[in-house]
Amino acid sequence: MTVYTASVTAPVNIATLKYWGKRDTKLNLPTNSSISVTLSQDDLRTLTSAATAPEFERDTLWLNGEPHSIDNERTQNCLRDLRQLRKEMESKDASLPTLSQWKLHIVSENNFPTAAGLASSAAGFAALVSAIAKLYQLPQSTSEISRIARKGSGSACRSLFGGYVAWEMGKAEDGHDSMAVQIADSSDWPQMKACVLVVSDIKKDVSSTQGMQLTVATSELFKERIEHVVPKRFEVMRKAIVEKDFATFAKETMMDSNSFHATCLDSFPPIFYMNDTSKRIISWCHTINQFYGETIVAYTFDAGPNAVLYYLAENESKLFAFIYKLFGSVPGWDKKFTTEQLEAFNHQFESSNFTARELDLELQKDVARVILTQVGSGPQETNESLIDAKTGLPKE
């Protein structure tokens, strides 16, 4: 049996200008454009291997070691579009193997909790679509492939690029102009770093799909957001990224996170994605910025309680004097800093005259893990396969 395979890793992206609301639920067309930062795959990634052979009996998906349904409409839409593009290639070149007619085996693994507010669906669909596109050797551009990923999970289209990415909402009813484009590569502003504070890795009560449609249907504040707030902020944030203006980027990121969660609260019944710990982290960030007299850290929260803190490498010692004091006892610090660096963080805190009350030491018991990462690249083809090339089945 000849088995054709391809494997790809894809990154998590965290929106700094949030996507929330669909104007077309089948095509995943958004009510507003959005912007995100792609995070390094050294720390957060999905690895997906795709295989095909004429002997395969049915399309099959394994996710994190378990068989998983592949029949849902979103996945089927992606597979159909990818097969159609491959079929068009085969019709023009009779020498090509007819991969589009064969069934697929797809094996995928995350190195972070699924459905925990860490954009796992974005990385997952970006990896799935990219792996099959590589398997089929499709010639389309990354932006064109991002349109297919969008049908799986809206924010997945942004994980097709590294660096700083815009998902342009488009205007066409068929969605052909709703796709991801890169604002800047990770190498253009490599100093951007991120610290994820995992408050909870439990699956959220209200899914993003359910939540955003409730907001669209019931929130008056949402209408103001998509018509006035987001279009203006989109241009300001894009300019800040191009000009590497962290102060503006940080302010707009925090304000947009607040705006997004305000529309969730304005939905009826209201949606609570953040919890008390999330709110205390927000207050803590503002306290740190006020302490230094400049904006050195920005927070953002997706549809969940976990915080993503953005900061520049040049301010790492200032920020981590406090972060390490608070969260140094929770998992996630391995091999990220030397013993000397950690001791320096402690020394800087001790000399800061910052009080325990201002620091909110109680926060340390409410954060389960820290993930220390930075801006990173888009999907990468890899030789690390999850599929046995002889059998076409997941490796044991």
From Swiss-Prot:
A GO MF term: diphosphomevalonate decarboxylase activity
Reaction equation(s) it catalyzes: (R)-5-diphosphomevalonate + ATP = isopentenyl diphosphate + ADP + phosphate + CO2
Enzyme Commission number(s) of this protein: 4.1.1.33
An example Gene Ontology CC term for this record: cytoplasm
Record keywords, A-Z: ATP-binding, Lipid biosynthesis, Lipid metabolism, Lyase, Nucleotide-binding, Steroid biosynthesis, Steroid metabolism, Sterol biosynthesis, Sterol metabolism
Pathway this chain belongs to: Isoprenoid biosynthesis; isopentenyl diphosphate biosynthesis via mevalonate pathway; isopentenyl diphosphate from (R)-mevalonate: step 3/3
Pfam annotation, one family: MDD_C
Residues given in the record as (R)-5-diphosphomevalonate binding sites: 19-22, 74, 153-158, 209
Any one GO BP annotation for this protein: sterol biosynthetic process
Subunit-level organization: Homodimer.
Further comment found in the protein's record: Present with 13700 molecules/cell in log phase SD medium.
NCBIfam families, alphabetized: mevDPdecarb (TIGR01240)
Function: Diphosphomevalonate decarboxylase; part of the second module of ergosterol biosynthesis pathway that includes the middle steps of the pathway. MVD1/ERG19 converts diphosphomevalonate into isopentenyl diphosphate. The second module is carried out in the vacuole and involves the formation of farnesyl diphosphate, which is also an important intermediate in the biosynthesis of ubiquinone, dolichol, heme and prenylated proteins. Activity by the mevalonate kinase ERG12 first converts mevalonate into 5-phosphomevalonate.
Similarity comment: Belongs to the diphosphomevalonate decarboxylase family.
Name assigned to this protein: Diphosphomevalonate decarboxylase
Upper lineage: Eukaryota, Fungi, Dikarya, Ascomycota, Saccharomycotina
